[in-house]
Amino acid sequence: MKIGIIGAMEPEVAHLVESMENPSSTTIAGIEFVAGQLAGKDVIVTRSGIGKVTASIATTLLIEKYAPDVIINTGSAGGFADELAIGDIVISSEVRHHDVDVTAFGYEIGQMAQQPAAFIPDAKLVAAAQKAVASLGEVKAIEGLICTGDSFICDPVRTKTMLENFPTMAACEMEGAAIAQVCHQFGVPFVVIRSLSDNANNDSPVDFDEYIVKAGHHSALMVIALLKQL
């Protein structure tokens, strides 16, 4: 099995790349792909850059050039679940865009035209992630809705609106739904795994800068533990 792993930022992929055997790096359109072995599996770790456009480009290039059997999106997110703290993990039960609105044409809020309202992760990958949780010690993990948009969320008014639109949202970030949509169109199984770097409030910019390394490391550890379950 060949596994594609995508993270947006250096702190989100650094531990994965450092842990790889026989790494070989290629850069295409400013996006870095590192192929090698991790936890006994053939992997391609991809640093996509931030946001939905670069994530879509990275995912398409990853699929076209390396043909992975599955794709895992790892990294940080803002938290919305009361039971989670910074550093805890959300495993996607579904992934949606939060900044798409074509409801005038009869679609759900967050649903892109001619696309499903929600992108559903692969059940086997989710099950493997659930089993991997036990190896993380004090880090807590839940399954939940992860929403994606091209904004860093730190405005309470915007947070309120998002929760009105997506009341079960556990986390929000800036790449997952784009990656999921590309995987959907190519027929590649996926899962999104995010560790919380902030709580999507007024303190989020400060929290993010302080905790991005911790969140990226926790998410990377979760991915490595997941690989051992495959």
Swiss-Prot record:
Annotated residues for binding of substrate: G78, I153, M174, E175
Catalytic activity as recorded in UniProt: S-adenosyl-L-homocysteine + H2O = S-(5-deoxy-D-ribos-5-yl)-L-homocysteine + adenine; S-methyl-5'-thioadenosine + H2O = 5-(methylsulfanyl)-D-ribose + adenine; 5'-deoxyadenosine + H2O = 5-deoxy-D-ribose + adenine
Pfam families: PNP_UDP_1
UniProt keywords, alphabetically: Amino-acid biosynthesis, Hydrolase, Methionine biosynthesis
Pathway named in the protein's UniProt entry: Amino-acid biosynthesis; L-methionine biosynthesis via salvage pathway; S-methyl-5-thio-alpha-D-ribose 1-phosphate from S-methyl-5'-thioadenosine (hydrolase route): step 1/2
Top-level taxon: Bacteria
Catalytic residues (positions): E12, D198
EC number assigned by the record: 3.2.2.9
GO biological process, one term: L-methionine salvage from S-adenosylmethionine
GO molecular function, one term: methylthioadenosine nucleosidase activity
Primary enzyme class: hydrolase
GO cellular component: cytosol
Function: Catalyzes the irreversible cleavage of the glycosidic bond in both 5'-methylthioadenosine (MTA) and S-adenosylhomocysteine (SAH/AdoHcy) to adenine and the corresponding thioribose, 5'-methylthioribose and S-ribosylhomocysteine, respectively. Also cleaves 5'-deoxyadenosine, a toxic by-product of radical S-adenosylmethionine (SAM) enzymes, into 5-deoxyribose and adenine.
NCBIfam families per record: MTA_SAH-Nsdase, PRK05584.1
Annotated family: Belongs to the PNP/UDP phosphorylase family. MtnN subfamily.
Protein name, UniProt field: 5'-methylthioadenosine/S-adenosylhomocysteine nucleosidase
Source species of the chain: Shewanella halifaxensis (strain HAW-EB4)
